[in-house]
Amino acid sequence: MEKTFNLTRREDGIAILMMDVPGETMNTLKAEFGPEISEILSEIKRDSSIRGLVLISGKKDSFVAGADISMLDACQTAGDAKALSQQGHVVFNELEALNIPVVAAIHGACLGGGLELALACHQRVCSDDGKTMLGVPEVQLGLLPGGGGTQRLPRLVGITTALDMMLTGKQIRPKQALKMGLVNDVVPQTILLQTAVEMALAGKRTAKPVKKSLVNQLLEGTGFGRNIIFDQAAKQVVKKTQGNYPAPAKIIDCVRQGMAKGMQKGLEVEASHFAELVVSKESEALRSIFFATTEMKKETGAEGATPRKVKKAVILGGGLMGGGIASVTTTKAKIPARVKDINEKGLSNALSYAYKLLDKGVKRRHMTPAVRDNLMALMTTTTEYKGVKDADIVVEAVFEDLALKHQMVKDIERECGEHTIFASNTSSLPIGQIAQAASRPENVIGLHYFSPVEKMPLVEVIAHAKTSPETIATTVAFARKQGKTPIVVQDGAGFYVNRILALYMNEAAQLLLEGQSIEHLDKALVKFGFPVGPITLLDEVGIDVGAKIAPILEKELGERFKAPAAFDKLLSDDRKGRKNGKGFYQYAAGNKASSKKKAVDESVYAVLGIKPGMDKDLSAVAERCVVQMLNEAVRCLDDGIIASPRDGDIGAIFGIGFPPFLGGPFHYIDTLGADNLVNILERYQAQYGDRFEPCPRLKAMAAEKARFF
């Protein structure tokens, strides 16, 4: 049986401990490694010829990417999870207690348990490579660093910096890591091992303390000051999470207790809190998302199909969406993109959009001006169909006009090769209707991005009846290269995301017309766990956009999608939302919010002919909106729009910000119980009408006490 850890001795007395998990592309820490590491550490202690130890990875591009998350699912109880954390403590304490210098030589991902392993070493040196990132992202899985990270990190880099890392899960680049004292040196990968050996030979066992500002010294150096830091962090956590995520508060408590009562007490608290989080419903939901997205990365989107390589892309339309799509194509996928627009202004906008995004990277020192300029060189523009013949994929991002899109299809089929894919970014028009203009309908597909393109992770890949499996697979692979999470959905009005969002938004509108205030509505859904409330979202998306989509959905899917007629009054009053600085909220010049907390434009109530002040309980308001979304998500599964509950969960979380700690609509239905959800829907149906009628599948599941997972 192949070993994961291999110890070799050099003539100069330095031992190299190489970690290389057999058969895996990245190193992850597993429970079964404990005895193996302990045995090696005992061997090192017995050998007096060993003067120092260097820990390095045998993998090409990763140090240790973290702990193997599947270990946690094997934990039947909190006691099992606590034992797992304690085992890590024993091994890392043993490593730290070695009486010879121990140096971690880091190249590639050094995350979670990987960073905790490095923290147990006496010094750290990392490569200056772009692939090298350090961090403790456990909070993103509803967990905390359970291998001593909550104790060693604040002692190394300071409480404020450590809390920032642990509460956000942010990843740190090499130069930043050096500046903050997380590593002792940053060197080219070619001399990484040599440098680590020299550090071990130098015999230093402790790192030089990082220089702190006077304010930080005063705050972190006294019990009173530390309490200010912890109290402030706790307030920020509640504000950001609405109390929906238990991990951040437990991270703060681990650090607070460890700094007040010592390392040993801190480790005890860490193990207990880690165990509580492992078995929490929030972490289970967040881990399900992690496993789902990992699983999806292995799929092509069309069984048995092999994607073609995309070497060149063309984007039709230089507007906000077109510019964003071109930008992620060049900067993320590193694929040349040619933007075609009917006028120079559109092209100028697309170039400016891409440049501003890249220049932000330069200002934040994530890239050099030369890298920015090289990426910009991948984007070219044209007002005619020149330089488009060899395109492998054309992404159309023009106005939502079927005749215009038909013309685009004909133009591309005339100007490009037989294999060229035509991908429409339509948000509402069925792809089958767009493909009616095509002589090669098998090449036509939907590729629905969400705005702003560079920030929103989801894309819907929409196959119509004649789309070929190869077209689907190629489009999915293209979207992944752009850094997106694609879900394949079938053709139909609203596809999946906009369809479930529409009923949620309509219900919020009904509540507004019944007298719920705008602030109350938004507050209710933010407290429930959405990133923004429905009224804020409508302002952001555009009231006019919502008005265009609603009739299409109503025509194709029925009366339940009918938008409140009162909203026509908003358009008559020229209220489009943030885009024209006139919507539900007030906007200052330049369409920027007038303050951090936006103020409601009170005049909107008069336009709608309503009087606010009938505010109901926050949870009741949220429930009415959310159950509409849940019911429609199940309908989409029944209609074959989505292939599985897993895809439905990922689409809702990454497309509209459905609360991740609930695991997605289908996981949440399992938590509620289909029978409970049916009862809630039937209660609302009796009060408000048939738009709340539970779909047949939900009723059947309720009768059988069935689950999705």
Curated annotation (Swiss-Prot):
Query: Can you provide one Gene Ontology molecular function annotated for this UniProt record?
Result: long-chain-3-hydroxyacyl-CoA dehydrogenase activity
Sorted alphabetically, which InterPro entries does this protein's record hold? Answer: 3-OHacyl-CoA_DH_NAD-bd, 3HC_DH_C, 6-PGluconate_DH-like_C_sf, ClpP/crotonase-like_dom_sf, Enoyl-CoA_hydra/iso, FA_oxidation_alpha_subunit, FadJ, NAD(P)-bd_dom_sf
Gene3D superfamilies documented for this protein:
1.10.1040.50, 2-enoyl-CoA Hydratase, Chain A, domain 1, NAD(P)-binding Rossmann-like Domain
Going by the UniProt record, its keywords in alphabetical order are:
Cytoplasm, Fatty acid metabolism, Isomerase, Lipid degradation, Lipid metabolism, Lyase, Multifunctional enzyme, NAD, Oxidoreductase
Q: Which organism is it from?
A: Shewanella sp. (strain ANA-3)
Protein name listed in UniProt: Fatty acid oxidation complex subunit alpha
Q: Name one GO cellular component term.
A: cytoplasm
> EC number(s)?
4.2.1.17, 5.1.2.3, 1.1.1.35
Pathway named in the protein's UniProt entry: Lipid metabolism; fatty acid beta-oxidation
Supply one GO BP term.
fatty acid beta-oxidation
User: What does the UniProt record say this protein does?
Assistant: Catalyzes the formation of a hydroxyacyl-CoA by addition of water on enoyl-CoA. Also exhibits 3-hydroxyacyl-CoA epimerase and 3-hydroxyacyl-CoA dehydrogenase activities.
**Top-rank taxon:** Bacteria
HAMAP family named in the record:
FadJ (MF_01617)
State its location(s).
Cytoplasm
Q: Where is this region: Enoyl-CoA hydratase?
A: 1-188
- The site annotation (Important for catalytic activity) covers E116, E138
3-hydroxyacyl-CoA dehydrogenase as annotated region, ranges: 308-709
- Which reactions appear under catalytic activity for this entry? a (3S)-3-hydroxyacyl-CoA = a (2E)-enoyl-CoA + H2O; a 4-saturated-(3S)-3-hydroxyacyl-CoA = a (3E)-enoyl-CoA + H2O; a (3S)-3-hydroxyacyl-CoA + NAD(+) = a 3-oxoacyl-CoA + NADH + H(+); (3S)-3-hydroxybutanoyl-CoA = (3R)-3-hydroxybutanoyl-CoA
Q: Does the keyword Lyase apply?
A: yes
The entry sums up its family as follows:
In the N-terminal section; belongs to the enoyl-CoA hydratase/isomerase family. In the central section; belongs to the 3-hydroxyacyl-CoA dehydrogenase family.
How does this chain assemble?
Answer: Heterotetramer of two alpha chains (FadJ) and two beta chains (FadI).
